[in-house]
Amino acid sequence: MSAADRRILIVKLADLGDLLLCEPAIRSLRTAFPAARIDLLVPPATAPLAHLLGHDLSVLTFPKSLFDNLTALARPNRFAQAVRFGLQLRRAHYNTVVVLHHLTTPGGATKQRWLARATSAANVVGLDNGRGNFLTARVIDLGFGAKHEATYMLDVARAAGGAPVDPAPQVDRASVQRGPALPADYAVIYPATGPYSSARTWPVERYGAVASALAADGLTPVVVGSRGEAQLGAHIRNAVPSTIDLMGATSLPELAGVVTGARIVVGGDSFVGHLAAALDVPRVTIFGPSNRDAWRPWGSVDVDNVDIDSTFNGAVVYHDLPCQPCLYAGYRLGRPEGCPTRTCLNRVAVAEVLQAIDRILKAS
């Protein structure tokens, strides 16, 4: 097969943070196949991130939420939409499909199997936890947290013929935009953790206390997030009037610009922490029920491993309980909304986060 004839479909039907963690895998494939057509299949909401990743990708979108419940296919309009999309995939004549997903649930595995078969590609590569009988090349899935998610996805790309590359997720810095004018010294706070699991969200009044302490130390708090999360930004702004509220006010390239200029970035398990890591910006990430070994921002270490003599610029703050993580543990989906008390998250005190911020600022 000539390089120009190679057609690769990368499947990542996930949120922004998960897509960013796939950047090394995408880079691995583009490095190995510079002349190939590489298409990236993502949900509509994450498509804008592809431009920030670079790598000369064509982007296809698939509204996976419409088909999360397979009984939805019984609706005539949904079934027709799925058939039309399947025909679109078939007409693209892909040689290889790279599935950058764990096959965690039977329904999820069925969805990936359908997408792969719709393409009629000869090669289908992905993680196998026992549900991957449709794969032609398999990477053994050792369970969530046995490897970092970025490492898992890079392993899949390598199994598809990808080149060895730096495993740290990166963004195309030429695509980063300056965004709003900000003071010279500021700290970014992202209080929300996205729509999938609100159980990862630390209490907003504690973010207000962190913002107050940062302001007292001469760092202007800058709050970022989506327009739908604006009430969290308003709460922090009311607590600390000097706060600059950019909730819903930036594009992704502008958000990257805001993060790039920050002295430190503070928040929960979500996209902005991964973006800070990709831009090599100091960061403190608060974990509750989700799996920190799987999803910690790349290069971030447990806060107890950070001291003023270290070179780490990212710390993870958490309380390790026997029941934690309860979201994406082993091979199970677990509990997206955590337990009713969310003890692991609520035990993280403001003082602990401020201590982590102090350690990272001194170390970096």
Report residues per predicted region.
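Catalytic machinery of carbohydrate-active enzymes
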Residues: 1-364
